[in-house]
Protein backbone atom coordinates (compact mmCIF):
# COMPACT_ATOMS: atom_id res chain seq x y z
CA UNK A 1 0.00 0.00 0.00
CA UNK A 2 1.37 3.44 -0.99
CA UNK A 3 1.40 5.62 2.16
CA UNK A 4 2.79 8.82 0.51
CA UNK A 5 -0.64 10.41 -0.23
CA UNK A 6 -1.62 9.85 3.38
CA UNK A 7 1.55 11.60 4.64
CA UNK A 8 1.01 14.57 2.31
CA UNK A 9 -2.61 14.87 3.43
CA UNK A 10 -1.52 14.90 7.07
CA UNK A 11 1.01 17.67 6.40
CA UNK A 12 -1.56 19.77 4.55
CA UNK A 13 -4.06 19.25 7.34
CA UNK A 14 -1.45 20.37 9.86
CA UNK A 15 -0.68 23.53 7.87
CA UNK A 16 -4.31 24.42 7.34
CA UNK A 17 -5.22 23.99 10.97
CA UNK A 18 -2.14 25.76 12.38
CA UNK A 19 -2.62 29.24 13.78
CA UNK A 20 -0.29 31.82 12.33
CA UNK A 21 0.80 35.42 12.78
CA UNK A 22 2.76 37.50 10.29
CA UNK A 23 4.65 40.77 10.47
CA UNK A 24 4.41 43.10 7.50
CA UNK A 25 4.02 46.61 6.19
CA UNK A 26 1.59 48.78 4.30
CA UNK A 27 1.23 48.59 0.55
CA UNK A 28 -0.97 51.01 -1.41
CA UNK A 29 -1.96 51.77 -4.98
CA UNK A 30 0.15 54.93 -4.79
CA UNK A 31 2.05 56.01 -7.90
CA UNK A 32 4.44 58.22 -5.91
CA UNK A 33 8.13 57.84 -6.70
CA UNK A 34 11.26 59.36 -5.18
CA UNK A 35 14.95 59.44 -6.00
CA UNK A 36 17.76 58.30 -3.74
CA UNK A 37 21.53 58.46 -4.13
CA UNK A 38 21.58 54.95 -5.59
CA UNK A 39 18.20 54.65 -7.32
CA UNK A 40 15.81 56.77 -9.34
CA UNK A 41 12.02 56.46 -9.38
CA UNK A 42 11.71 54.30 -6.27
CA UNK A 43 7.99 53.53 -5.63
CA UNK A 44 6.85 54.68 -2.18
CA UNK A 45 3.54 54.65 -0.36
CA UNK A 46 3.67 58.41 0.19
CA UNK A 47 5.91 61.42 -0.36
CA UNK A 48 5.79 65.19 -0.22
CA UNK A 49 7.14 67.67 -2.72
CA UNK A 50 9.32 70.16 -0.86
CA UNK A 51 9.28 72.74 -3.69
CA UNK A 52 6.44 75.29 -3.97
CA UNK A 53 5.59 76.34 -7.52
CA UNK A 54 2.26 78.17 -7.02
CA UNK A 55 1.68 81.84 -6.18
CA UNK A 56 -1.22 84.29 -6.03
CA UNK A 57 -0.21 86.33 -9.06
CA UNK A 58 -0.95 89.53 -7.11
CA UNK A 59 0.52 91.85 -4.53
CA UNK A 60 -0.87 91.05 -1.07
CA UNK A 61 -0.61 92.40 2.44
CA UNK A 62 2.41 90.91 4.14
CA UNK A 63 1.54 89.49 7.56
CA UNK A 64 -1.40 91.89 7.77
CA UNK A 65 0.52 95.05 6.76
CA UNK A 66 -0.47 96.59 3.43
CA UNK A 67 2.05 97.48 0.73
CA UNK A 68 2.24 100.95 -0.78
CA UNK A 69 2.03 101.47 -4.53
CA UNK A 70 3.73 104.68 -5.64
CA UNK A 71 1.30 105.02 -8.52
CA UNK A 72 2.54 107.28 -11.32
CA UNK A 73 5.61 108.29 -9.31
CA UNK A 74 9.00 106.67 -9.29
CA UNK A 75 10.91 106.16 -6.07
CA UNK A 76 13.08 109.20 -6.83
CA UNK A 77 10.10 111.42 -7.65
CA UNK A 78 8.39 110.40 -4.39
CA UNK A 79 11.37 110.80 -2.11
CA UNK A 80 12.45 114.26 -3.30
CA UNK A 81 8.87 115.53 -3.51
CA UNK A 82 7.91 115.88 -7.16
CA UNK A 83 4.85 118.20 -7.02
CA UNK A 84 2.93 115.69 -9.16
CA UNK A 85 3.32 113.16 -6.32
CA UNK A 86 1.61 115.07 -3.51
CA UNK A 87 -0.88 112.23 -3.01
CA UNK A 88 2.00 110.08 -1.76
CA UNK A 89 3.24 112.60 0.83
CA UNK A 90 1.02 111.11 3.52
CA UNK A 91 2.60 107.66 3.29
CA UNK A 92 3.87 106.57 6.70
CA UNK A 93 3.93 102.77 6.89
CA UNK A 94 4.27 99.88 4.48
CA UNK A 95 5.27 96.24 4.31
CA UNK A 96 6.97 96.85 0.99
CA UNK A 97 6.94 99.43 -1.80
CA UNK A 98 5.70 98.90 -5.34
CA UNK A 99 7.13 100.99 -8.14
CA UNK A 100 5.90 101.04 -11.71
CA UNK A 101 9.03 100.66 -13.89
CA UNK A 102 7.50 103.08 -16.41
CA UNK A 103 6.16 105.63 -13.87
CA UNK A 104 6.00 109.05 -15.63
CA UNK A 105 6.78 111.21 -12.60
CA UNK A 106 10.38 110.87 -11.53
CA UNK A 107 12.88 113.71 -11.27
CA UNK A 108 11.01 116.48 -13.05
CA UNK A 109 14.15 118.59 -13.52
CA UNK A 110 17.10 117.10 -15.47
CA UNK A 111 19.61 115.59 -13.08
CA UNK A 112 20.18 112.66 -10.75
CA UNK A 113 19.82 111.46 -7.18
CA UNK A 114 23.27 110.69 -5.82
CA UNK A 115 23.81 107.11 -4.57
CA UNK A 116 20.32 106.21 -5.69
CA UNK A 117 20.92 102.47 -5.34
CA UNK A 118 22.16 102.84 -1.79
CA UNK A 119 19.13 104.96 -0.87
CA UNK A 120 16.82 102.33 -2.36
CA UNK A 121 18.57 99.68 -0.33
CA UNK A 122 18.15 101.82 2.79
CA UNK A 123 14.41 102.11 2.15
CA UNK A 124 14.20 98.35 1.69
CA UNK A 125 15.00 98.20 5.40
CA UNK A 126 12.50 100.86 6.50
CA UNK A 127 8.94 100.00 7.52
CA UNK A 128 7.65 103.42 8.56
CA UNK A 129 8.68 107.09 8.69
CA UNK A 130 7.19 110.53 9.19
CA UNK A 131 7.76 113.61 7.03
CA UNK A 132 8.88 116.64 9.02
CA UNK A 133 10.06 120.17 8.29
CA UNK A 134 13.77 120.56 8.95
CA UNK A 135 14.47 124.23 8.16
CA UNK A 136 11.79 126.85 7.38
CA UNK A 137 12.36 128.56 3.99
CA UNK A 138 11.84 131.99 5.50
CA UNK A 139 14.76 131.59 7.90
CA UNK A 140 17.47 131.73 5.24
CA UNK A 141 17.48 135.48 4.70
CA UNK A 142 17.38 137.71 1.63
CA UNK A 143 16.78 135.15 -1.10
CA UNK A 144 13.76 134.07 -3.12
CA UNK A 145 12.23 130.64 -3.69
CA UNK A 146 12.73 129.42 -7.24
CA UNK A 147 10.16 127.61 -9.38
CA UNK A 148 10.33 126.03 -12.80
CA UNK A 149 8.00 125.01 -15.59
CA UNK A 150 9.71 121.62 -15.59
CA UNK A 151 8.06 120.82 -12.24
CA UNK A 152 4.41 121.76 -12.43
CA UNK A 153 1.91 120.86 -9.73
CA UNK A 154 -1.47 119.26 -10.32
CA UNK A 155 -2.97 122.63 -11.29
CA UNK A 156 -0.33 123.27 -13.95
CA UNK A 157 1.42 125.98 -11.92
CA UNK A 158 5.22 126.25 -11.98
CA UNK A 159 6.59 124.68 -8.84
CA UNK A 160 9.59 122.76 -7.47
CA UNK A 161 10.46 119.70 -5.40
CA UNK A 162 8.42 119.96 -2.21
CA UNK A 163 11.20 118.64 0.03
CA UNK A 164 13.77 121.16 -1.24
CA UNK A 165 13.97 124.94 -1.73
CA UNK A 166 15.71 126.38 -4.78
CA UNK A 167 17.09 129.73 -3.70
CA UNK A 168 17.70 132.45 -6.30
CA UNK A 169 18.68 136.11 -6.01
CA UNK A 170 16.40 138.66 -4.39
CA UNK A 171 16.52 141.89 -6.32
CA UNK A 172 20.13 142.05 -7.43
CA UNK A 173 21.60 140.39 -4.37
CA UNK A 174 22.46 136.87 -3.23
CA UNK A 175 24.34 137.11 0.08
CA UNK A 176 26.07 134.21 1.80
CA UNK A 177 23.34 132.23 3.52
CA UNK A 178 23.87 129.66 6.27
CA UNK A 179 21.74 127.42 8.43
CA UNK A 180 22.29 124.38 10.68
CA UNK A 181 19.98 121.47 11.34
CA UNK A 182 20.33 119.67 14.67
CA UNK A 183 18.79 116.22 14.96
CA UNK A 184 17.02 116.28 18.30
CA UNK A 185 14.33 113.75 17.38
CA UNK A 186 16.02 110.79 19.04
CA UNK A 187 15.79 108.89 15.76
CA UNK A 188 17.62 108.73 12.45
CA UNK A 189 16.61 111.48 10.01
CA UNK A 190 17.02 111.50 6.23
CA UNK A 191 18.23 114.93 5.06
CA UNK A 192 18.42 115.93 1.37
CA UNK A 193 19.97 118.89 -0.40
CA UNK A 194 21.25 119.62 -3.91
CA UNK A 195 23.05 121.85 -6.37
CA UNK A 196 21.89 123.54 -9.55
CA UNK A 197 24.47 123.55 -12.35
CA UNK A 198 23.56 126.27 -14.91
CA UNK A 199 24.13 126.09 -18.63
CA UNK A 200 26.54 129.05 -18.68
CA UNK A 201 28.21 131.73 -16.59
CA UNK A 202 25.63 134.23 -17.80
CA UNK A 203 22.84 132.04 -16.46
CA UNK A 204 24.77 131.68 -13.21
CA UNK A 205 24.94 135.46 -12.80
CA UNK A 206 21.30 135.95 -13.74
CA UNK A 207 20.20 133.51 -11.05
CA UNK A 208 22.77 133.98 -8.29
CA UNK A 209 24.54 137.29 -9.12
CA UNK A 210 27.89 135.71 -8.24
CA UNK A 211 29.80 134.30 -11.23
CA UNK A 212 31.58 131.57 -9.26
CA UNK A 213 29.38 130.63 -6.30
CA UNK A 214 30.10 127.83 -3.83
CA UNK A 215 28.21 125.66 -1.39
CA UNK A 216 29.78 124.24 1.78
CA UNK A 217 28.20 121.31 3.64
CA UNK A 218 29.69 120.27 6.99
CA UNK A 219 29.04 117.81 9.79
CA UNK A 220 31.13 116.87 12.80
CA UNK A 221 32.78 114.06 10.83
CA UNK A 222 33.14 115.48 7.31
CA UNK A 223 33.03 118.68 5.25
CA UNK A 224 32.78 119.24 1.50
CA UNK A 225 32.84 122.35 -0.66
CA UNK A 226 30.94 122.19 -3.95
CA UNK A 227 31.52 124.38 -7.02
CA UNK A 228 29.00 124.78 -9.82
CA UNK A 229 29.83 122.99 -13.07
CA UNK A 230 28.39 125.05 -15.92
CA UNK A 231 27.71 123.50 -19.31
CA UNK A 232 24.99 122.38 -21.68
CA UNK A 233 23.71 118.87 -21.05
CA UNK A 234 21.03 116.67 -22.64
CA UNK A 235 17.82 117.86 -21.06
CA UNK A 236 14.09 117.36 -20.95
CA UNK A 237 10.98 119.25 -19.86
CA UNK A 238 12.38 122.32 -21.66
CA UNK A 239 15.52 122.52 -19.48
CA UNK A 240 19.20 122.16 -20.40
CA UNK A 241 20.76 122.86 -17.03
CA UNK A 242 21.20 120.14 -14.44
CA UNK A 243 20.55 119.39 -10.76
CA UNK A 244 22.24 116.86 -8.54
CA UNK A 245 20.55 115.88 -5.29
CA UNK A 246 22.45 114.51 -2.30
CA UNK A 247 21.31 112.86 0.92
CA UNK A 248 22.65 111.83 4.29
CA UNK A 249 21.23 109.84 7.21
CA UNK A 250 21.65 111.90 10.38
CA UNK A 251 21.85 109.95 13.64
CA UNK A 252 20.41 111.32 16.90
CA UNK A 253 22.43 114.26 18.24
CA UNK A 254 24.22 114.95 14.96
CA UNK A 255 24.04 118.28 13.12
CA UNK A 256 24.66 119.47 9.57
CA UNK A 257 25.46 123.01 8.37
CA UNK A 258 24.85 124.51 4.93
CA UNK A 259 26.58 127.63 3.65
CA UNK A 260 26.19 129.02 0.11
CA UNK A 261 26.23 132.12 -2.06
CA UNK A 262 24.48 130.53 -5.03
CA UNK A 263 23.23 127.27 -6.51
CA UNK A 264 22.02 125.65 -3.26
CA UNK A 265 18.93 123.44 -3.22
CA UNK A 266 18.33 123.72 0.51
CA UNK A 267 16.61 121.08 2.67
CA UNK A 268 13.07 121.83 3.74
CA UNK A 269 11.40 118.53 4.61
CA UNK A 270 13.10 115.34 5.71
CA UNK A 271 12.05 111.94 6.97
CA UNK A 272 12.24 110.67 10.55
CA UNK A 273 12.80 106.92 10.44
CA UNK A 274 10.23 105.46 12.82
CA UNK A 275 10.86 101.74 12.30
CA UNK A 276 13.43 99.63 10.56
CA UNK A 277 12.64 96.18 9.22
CA UNK A 278 12.94 93.97 6.19
CA UNK A 279 11.25 95.44 3.15
CA UNK A 280 11.67 95.61 -0.57
CA UNK A 281 10.97 97.80 -3.57
CA UNK A 282 9.23 95.63 -6.15
CA UNK A 283 8.95 96.62 -9.78
CA UNK A 284 6.30 94.75 -11.76
CA UNK A 285 2.90 95.56 -13.30
CA UNK A 286 0.81 93.02 -11.33
CA UNK A 287 -2.16 94.36 -9.38
CA UNK A 288 -2.75 94.71 -5.65
CA UNK A 289 -5.44 92.35 -4.35
CA UNK A 290 -7.26 91.95 -1.05
CA UNK A 291 -5.22 89.04 0.21
CA UNK A 292 -2.66 88.23 2.84
CA UNK A 293 0.58 86.35 2.43
CA UNK A 294 3.61 85.23 4.41
CA UNK A 295 5.96 85.68 1.47
CA UNK A 296 5.81 88.17 -1.40
CA UNK A 297 7.59 88.22 -4.74
CA UNK A 298 7.30 90.50 -7.74
CA UNK A 299 5.11 87.90 -9.47
CA UNK A 300 2.80 87.07 -6.55
CA UNK A 301 2.41 85.98 -2.95
CA UNK A 302 3.51 82.57 -1.68
CA UNK A 303 1.48 80.90 1.06
CA UNK A 304 3.06 77.55 1.81
CA UNK A 305 4.69 75.41 4.46
CA UNK A 306 7.08 73.88 1.97
CA UNK A 307 10.81 74.14 2.48
CA UNK A 308 11.75 75.45 -0.96
CA UNK A 309 10.30 77.52 -3.79
CA UNK A 310 11.40 78.07 -7.36
CA UNK A 311 9.11 81.02 -8.13
CA UNK A 312 11.50 83.93 -7.67
CA UNK A 313 14.82 84.55 -5.98
CA UNK A 314 13.97 88.11 -4.90
CA UNK A 315 11.36 87.27 -2.24
CA UNK A 316 10.33 89.05 0.96
CA UNK A 317 8.95 87.72 4.24
CA UNK A 318 8.80 84.27 5.78
CA UNK A 319 9.79 82.60 2.54
CA UNK A 320 10.96 79.14 1.54
CA UNK A 321 14.52 79.02 0.26
CA UNK A 322 14.76 79.64 -3.49
CA UNK A 323 16.29 76.81 -5.52
CA UNK A 324 16.37 76.09 -9.23
CA UNK A 325 14.87 72.60 -8.97
CA UNK A 326 11.20 72.38 -9.87
CA UNK A 327 10.61 69.29 -7.74
CA UNK A 328 12.27 67.64 -4.74
CA UNK A 329 10.27 64.72 -3.37
CA UNK A 330 10.93 63.51 0.15
CA UNK A 331 9.78 60.00 1.03
CA UNK A 332 7.34 60.09 3.93
CA UNK A 333 6.16 56.49 3.63
CA UNK A 334 7.59 53.09 2.90
CA UNK A 335 9.01 51.47 -0.17
CA UNK A 336 5.83 50.47 -2.00
CA UNK A 337 6.07 46.77 -2.86
CA UNK A 338 2.70 45.62 -4.24
CA UNK A 339 0.99 42.76 -2.44
CA UNK A 340 1.36 39.33 -4.04
CA UNK A 341 -2.06 37.91 -4.81
CA UNK A 342 -1.10 34.22 -4.84
CA UNK A 343 0.51 33.25 -1.58
CA UNK A 344 -0.49 29.65 -1.24
CA UNK A 345 -2.41 28.52 1.79
CA UNK A 346 -2.26 31.78 3.64
CA UNK A 347 -3.70 33.93 0.89
CA UNK A 348 -3.09 37.66 1.34
CA UNK A 349 -0.96 37.22 4.45
CA UNK A 350 2.74 37.50 3.77
CA UNK A 351 5.91 38.82 5.29
CA UNK A 352 8.17 41.74 4.68
CA UNK A 353 10.10 39.87 1.99
CA UNK A 354 7.27 39.12 -0.44
CA UNK A 355 5.45 42.44 -0.38
CA UNK A 356 3.20 44.78 1.52
CA UNK A 357 -0.43 44.56 2.61
CA UNK A 358 -3.15 46.83 1.22
CA UNK A 359 -5.40 46.41 4.27
CA UNK A 360 -3.47 48.15 7.05
CA UNK A 361 -5.38 51.04 8.61
CA UNK A 362 -3.85 53.79 10.78
CA UNK A 363 -0.39 52.33 10.51
CA UNK A 364 2.59 51.53 8.35
CA UNK A 365 3.62 48.33 10.10
CA UNK A 366 1.41 45.63 11.54
CA UNK A 367 0.28 42.05 11.98
CA UNK A 368 -1.96 39.61 10.19
CA UNK A 369 -3.13 36.43 11.86
CA UNK A 370 -5.12 33.32 11.10
CA UNK A 371 -6.85 31.13 13.67
CA UNK A 372 -10.14 29.31 14.19
CA UNK A 373 -11.93 32.66 14.47
CA UNK A 374 -10.78 33.72 11.02
CA UNK A 375 -8.22 36.08 9.55
CA UNK A 376 -7.47 39.49 11.08
CA UNK A 377 -5.18 42.45 10.51
CA UNK A 378 -4.03 45.19 12.88
CA UNK A 379 -1.52 48.04 12.69
CA UNK A 380 1.27 48.54 15.18
CA UNK A 381 0.63 52.18 16.05
CA UNK A 382 3.64 52.61 18.33
CA UNK A 383 6.25 51.76 15.69
CA UNK A 384 4.31 53.77 13.11
CA UNK A 385 4.21 56.85 15.34
CA UNK A 386 7.94 56.60 16.00
CA UNK A 387 8.56 56.49 12.25
CA UNK A 388 6.28 59.49 11.66
CA UNK A 389 8.10 61.43 14.38
CA UNK A 390 11.42 60.59 12.76
CA UNK A 391 10.21 61.83 9.37
CA UNK A 392 8.83 65.04 10.91
CA UNK A 393 12.24 65.58 12.48
CA UNK A 394 13.85 65.00 9.08
CA UNK A 395 11.71 67.71 7.49
CA UNK A 396 12.50 70.16 10.30
CA UNK A 397 16.19 69.33 10.01
CA UNK A 398 16.12 70.04 6.29
CA UNK A 399 14.52 73.43 6.99
CA UNK A 400 17.13 74.22 9.66
CA UNK A 401 20.02 73.11 7.48
CA UNK A 402 18.83 75.23 4.57
CA UNK A 403 18.24 78.39 6.58
CA UNK A 404 20.86 81.03 5.79
CA UNK A 405 21.52 84.70 6.21
CA UNK A 406 21.99 85.42 2.52
CA UNK A 407 19.65 88.00 1.02
CA UNK A 408 19.64 89.03 -2.62
CA UNK A 409 20.33 92.72 -3.26
CA UNK A 410 19.72 92.52 -7.01
CA UNK A 411 16.44 94.44 -6.93
CA UNK A 412 17.75 97.52 -5.17
CA UNK A 413 19.98 99.04 -7.83
CA UNK A 414 19.03 101.31 -10.71
CA UNK A 415 20.36 101.20 -14.22
CA UNK A 416 23.21 103.52 -13.25
CA UNK A 417 24.99 100.86 -11.20
CA UNK A 418 25.33 98.26 -13.95
CA UNK A 419 28.59 96.87 -12.61
CA UNK A 420 27.00 96.36 -9.20
CA UNK A 421 24.04 94.68 -10.88
CA UNK A 422 26.32 92.34 -12.80
CA UNK A 423 28.23 91.44 -9.66
CA UNK A 424 25.00 90.93 -7.70
CA UNK A 425 23.68 88.66 -10.46
CA UNK A 426 26.80 86.52 -10.41
CA UNK A 427 26.74 86.24 -6.63
CA UNK A 428 23.03 85.37 -6.66
CA UNK A 429 23.52 82.72 -9.35
CA UNK A 430 26.46 81.16 -7.54
CA UNK A 431 24.68 81.09 -4.19
CA UNK A 432 21.50 79.70 -5.77
CA UNK A 433 23.49 76.94 -7.46
CA UNK A 434 25.04 76.00 -4.12
CA UNK A 435 21.66 76.04 -2.34
CA UNK A 436 20.07 73.95 -5.12
CA UNK A 437 22.84 71.36 -5.07
CA UNK A 438 22.83 71.13 -1.28
CA UNK A 439 19.04 70.80 -1.18
CA UNK A 440 18.97 67.99 -3.75
CA UNK A 441 21.83 66.12 -2.09
CA UNK A 442 20.20 66.47 1.32
CA UNK A 443 16.86 65.12 0.07
CA UNK A 444 18.51 62.17 -1.71
CA UNK A 445 20.38 61.28 1.48
CA UNK A 446 17.26 61.57 3.61
CA UNK A 447 15.31 59.38 1.19
CA UNK A 448 17.96 56.69 1.50
CA UNK A 449 17.79 56.93 5.29
CA UNK A 450 13.99 56.87 5.32
CA UNK A 451 13.67 53.71 3.23
CA UNK A 452 16.41 52.00 5.23
CA UNK A 453 14.68 53.08 8.43
CA UNK A 454 11.41 51.44 7.34
CA UNK A 455 13.18 48.18 6.46
CA UNK A 456 14.85 48.22 9.87
CA UNK A 457 11.55 48.93 11.63
CA UNK A 458 9.86 45.91 10.02
CA UNK A 459 12.78 43.68 10.93
CA UNK A 460 12.81 45.00 14.48
CA UNK A 461 9.10 44.21 14.78
CA UNK A 462 9.73 40.73 13.39
CA UNK A 463 12.55 40.18 15.89
CA UNK A 464 10.33 41.41 18.71
CA UNK A 465 7.69 38.80 17.86
CA UNK A 466 10.32 36.07 17.51
CA UNK A 467 11.70 36.84 20.99
CA UNK A 468 8.17 36.89 22.40
CA UNK A 469 7.13 33.52 20.97
CA UNK A 470 10.47 31.75 21.54
CA UNK A 471 10.00 27.99 21.04
CA UNK A 472 6.22 28.27 20.84
CA UNK A 473 6.31 28.98 17.10
CA UNK A 474 8.22 28.13 13.95
CA UNK A 475 9.79 31.05 12.07
CA UNK A 476 9.00 30.44 8.41
CA UNK A 477 11.59 32.99 7.26
CA UNK A 478 9.16 35.16 5.31
CA UNK A 479 7.85 37.29 8.15
CA UNK A 480 5.37 34.67 9.35
CA UNK A 481 5.33 32.43 12.41
CA UNK A 482 3.44 29.13 12.63
CA UNK A 483 2.15 28.86 16.19
CA UNK A 484 2.51 25.48 17.85
CA UNK A 485 -0.56 26.00 19.99
CA UNK A 486 -4.10 27.24 19.60
CA UNK A 487 -4.24 31.03 19.74
CA UNK A 488 -7.56 32.89 19.67
CA UNK A 489 -7.95 36.61 18.98
CA UNK A 490 -7.19 37.54 22.61
CA UNK A 491 -4.04 35.49 22.44
CA UNK A 492 -3.07 37.24 19.19
CA UNK A 493 -3.57 40.59 20.92
CA UNK A 494 -1.06 39.62 23.62
CA UNK A 495 1.52 38.79 20.95
CA UNK A 496 0.99 42.16 19.32
CA UNK A 497 1.11 44.23 22.51
CA UNK A 498 3.99 42.34 24.12
CA UNK A 499 2.05 40.75 27.02
CA UNK A 500 2.16 37.20 25.62
CA UNK A 501 2.74 34.55 28.34
CA UNK A 502 5.20 32.09 26.84
CA UNK A 503 5.00 29.63 29.73
CA UNK A 504 1.23 29.29 29.43
CA UNK A 505 1.53 27.66 26.02
CA UNK A 506 4.93 25.99 26.39
CA UNK A 507 3.67 22.44 27.10
CA UNK A 508 1.14 22.44 24.26
CA UNK A 509 3.76 23.83 21.89
CA UNK A 510 6.27 21.18 22.95
CA UNK A 511 3.85 18.36 22.19
CA UNK A 512 2.92 19.91 18.84
CA UNK A 513 6.57 20.26 17.87
CA UNK A 514 7.22 16.59 18.77
CA UNK A 515 4.20 15.55 16.72
CA UNK A 516 5.38 17.51 13.69
CA UNK A 517 8.92 16.20 13.99
CA UNK A 518 7.58 12.63 14.38
CA UNK A 519 5.54 12.89 11.21
CA UNK A 520 8.54 14.24 9.38
CA UNK A 521 10.78 11.38 10.60
CA UNK A 522 8.20 8.68 9.67
CA UNK A 523 7.71 10.25 6.29
CA UNK A 524 11.42 10.29 5.66
CA UNK A 525 11.75 6.58 6.75
CA UNK A 526 8.95 5.46 4.42
CA UNK A 527 10.47 7.37 1.57
CA UNK A 528 13.81 5.67 2.14
CA UNK A 529 12.12 2.18 2.14
CA UNK A 530 10.27 2.95 -1.07
CA UNK A 531 13.44 4.13 -2.71
CA UNK A 532 15.24 0.89 -1.69
CA UNK A 533 12.50 -1.32 -3.20
CA UNK A 534 12.44 0.70 -6.41
CA UNK A 535 16.22 0.49 -6.62
CA UNK A 536 16.26 -3.29 -6.14
CA UNK A 537 13.56 -3.91 -8.75
CA UNK A 538 15.25 -1.59 -11.23
CA UNK A 539 18.59 -3.34 -10.77
CA UNK A 540 17.03 -6.80 -11.32
CA UNK A 541 15.26 -5.69 -14.47
CA UNK A 542 18.48 -4.29 -15.88
CA UNK A 543 20.40 -7.50 -15.04
CA UNK A 544 17.81 -9.78 -16.69
CA UNK A 545 17.81 -7.58 -19.75
CA UNK A 546 21.56 -7.82 -20.09
CA UNK A 547 21.49 -11.66 -19.82
CA UNK A 548 18.78 -11.98 -22.48
CA UNK A 549 20.65 -9.66 -24.81
CA UNK A 550 23.82 -11.73 -24.47
CA UNK A 551 21.99 -15.00 -25.24
CA UNK A 552 20.37 -13.55 -28.34
CA UNK A 553 23.71 -12.26 -29.62
CA UNK A 554 25.40 -15.60 -29.07
CA UNK A 555 22.69 -17.53 -30.92
CA UNK A 556 22.72 -15.23 -33.88
CA UNK A 557 26.49 -15.66 -34.33
CA UNK A 558 26.42 -19.49 -34.07
CA UNK A 559 28.29 -19.54 -30.84
CA UNK A 560 25.34 -20.81 -28.92
CA UNK A 561 23.24 -23.91 -29.70
CA UNK A 562 20.25 -25.41 -27.92
CA UNK A 563 19.62 -29.20 -28.08
CA UNK A 564 16.16 -30.33 -27.19
CA UNK A 565 15.76 -34.00 -26.30
CA UNK A 566 12.44 -35.70 -26.04
Swiss-Prot record:
Record localization: Virion membrane; Host apical cell membrane
Cellular compartments per GO CC: host cell plasma membrane; membrane; viral envelope; virion membrane
Similarity comment text for this entry: Belongs to the influenza viruses hemagglutinin family.
A single BP term in Gene Ontology: viral budding from plasma membrane
Lipid attachment, kind S-palmitoyl cysteine: 555, 565
A Pfam family: Hemagglutinin
Keyword Protein biosynthesis: no
Summary of subunit composition and partner proteins: Homotrimer of disulfide-linked HA1-HA2.
Residues at the site labelled Cleavage: 343-344
Residues glycosylated per entry: 29, 54, 182-183, 305, 488, 497
Regions of this protein lying in the Extracellular compartment: 19-532
The organism's place on the tree of life at top rank: Viruses
Transmembrane segments: 533-553
UniProt organism field: Influenza A virus (strain A/Whale/Maine/328/1984 H13N2)
Its job: Binds to sialic acid-containing receptors on the cell surface, bringing about the attachment of the virus particle to the cell. This attachment induces virion internalization of about two third of the virus particles through clathrin-dependent endocytosis and about one third through a clathrin- and caveolin-independent pathway. Plays a major role in the determination of host range restriction and virulence. Class I viral fusion protein. Binds to sialic acid-containing receptors on the cell surface, bringing about the attachment of the virus particle to the cell. This attachment induces virion internalization either through clathrin-dependent endocytosis or through clathrin- and caveolin-independent pathway. Plays a major role in the determination of host range restriction and virulence. Class I viral fusion protein. Responsible for penetration of the virus into the cell cytoplasm by mediating the fusion of the membrane of the endocytosed virus particle with the endosomal membrane.
Keywords: Clathrin- and caveolin-independent endocytosis of virus by host, Clathrin-mediated endocytosis of virus by host, Disulfide bond, Fusion of virus membrane with host endosomal membrane, Fusion of virus membrane with host membrane, Glycoprotein, Hemagglutinin, Host cell membrane, Host membrane, Host-virus interaction, Lipoprotein, Membrane, Palmitate, Signal, Transmembrane, Transmembrane helix, Viral attachment to host cell, Viral envelope protein, Viral penetration into host cytoplasm, Virion, Virus endocytosis by host, Virus entry into host cell
Signal sequence interval, chain numbering: 1-18
Post-translational modification (record): Palmitoylated.
Name assigned to this protein: Hemagglutinin
Membrane-topology descriptor: Single-pass type I membrane protein
Disulfide-linked positions: 22-480, 60-291, 73-85, 108-151, 295-319, 487-491
UniProt GO molecular function: host cell surface receptor binding
Spans within the Cytoplasmic topological domain: 554-566
InterPro entries: Capsid_hemagglutn (IPR008980), Hemagglutn_HA1_a/b_dom_sf (IPR013828), Hemagglutn_influenz_A (IPR000149), Hemagglutn_influenz_A/B (IPR001364)
Miscellaneous: Major glycoprotein, comprises over 80% of the envelope proteins present in virus particle. The extent of infection into host organism is determined by HA. Influenza viruses bud from the apical surface of polarized epithelial cells (e.g. bronchial epithelial cells) into lumen of lungs and are therefore usually pneumotropic. The reason is that HA is cleaved by tryptase clara which is restricted to lungs. However, HAs of H5 and H7 pantropic avian viruses subtypes can be cleaved by furin and subtilisin-type enzymes, allowing the virus to grow in other organs than lungs.
Amino acid sequence: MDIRPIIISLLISTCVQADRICVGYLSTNSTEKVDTLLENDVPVTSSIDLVETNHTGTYCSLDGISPVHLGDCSFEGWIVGNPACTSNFGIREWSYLIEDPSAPHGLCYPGELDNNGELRHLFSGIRSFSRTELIAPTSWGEVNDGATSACRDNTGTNSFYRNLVWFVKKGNSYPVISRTYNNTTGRDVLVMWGLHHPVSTDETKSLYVNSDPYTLVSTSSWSKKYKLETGVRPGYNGQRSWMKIYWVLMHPGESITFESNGGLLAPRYGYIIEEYGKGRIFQSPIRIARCNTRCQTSVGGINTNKTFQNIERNALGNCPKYIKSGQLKLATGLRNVPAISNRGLFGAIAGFIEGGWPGLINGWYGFQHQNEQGVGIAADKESTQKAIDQITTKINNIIDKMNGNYDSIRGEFSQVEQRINMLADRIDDAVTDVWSYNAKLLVLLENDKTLDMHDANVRNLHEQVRRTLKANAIDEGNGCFELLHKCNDSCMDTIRNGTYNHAEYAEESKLKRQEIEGIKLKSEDNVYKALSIYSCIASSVVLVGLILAFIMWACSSGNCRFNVCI
